[in-house]
Amino acid sequence: MYLALRLSAESEQDIRNGLLWDKVEPVTPSEEFHLTVIHSPESTIKLKKHTSEAWEALKAAGAMLTDEPLVAHSEGLVTFGGGIKVAALKLNLTNRLDVFRTLAEAVLFEANIPWSTQWGFSPHVTLGRGRVKLTETFPSVVTFNSMEWRE
């Protein structure tokens, strides 16, 4: 499972319009862009039975996104992955993003659910596989307006 922050429709469209994919090499753009706050190999079933102060605080922070979207500045393209590389948009780590991560860790810790620790938290939006460039119209700021746990 993972906790995803979902981009506003406008930000998702602005990102798609601001990408220039390689025309020679095969590319696979992501179907939907999001920011993974935290990842766990466990299922959300265990999480649905859990309640705590951290869980309530995280739900409240997620509900606030509708009225007060989270704003993040893009820091350019990066590449992640071992054998299969993916292009990603690196984002600055804001205090608000850090709060989401801290609360998500607390929720999983209190529920005795492990989370992936192989890499540190590096806020980014995975764009897809293949070579890509940013055009002049690429947004310098993106907004997230909802949160959800996914399988």
Regions found by a protein language model. Give the residues of each.
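Histidine-dependent nucleotide/RNA phosphoesterase domain, centered on the 2H-phosphoesterase fold
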Residues: 1-151
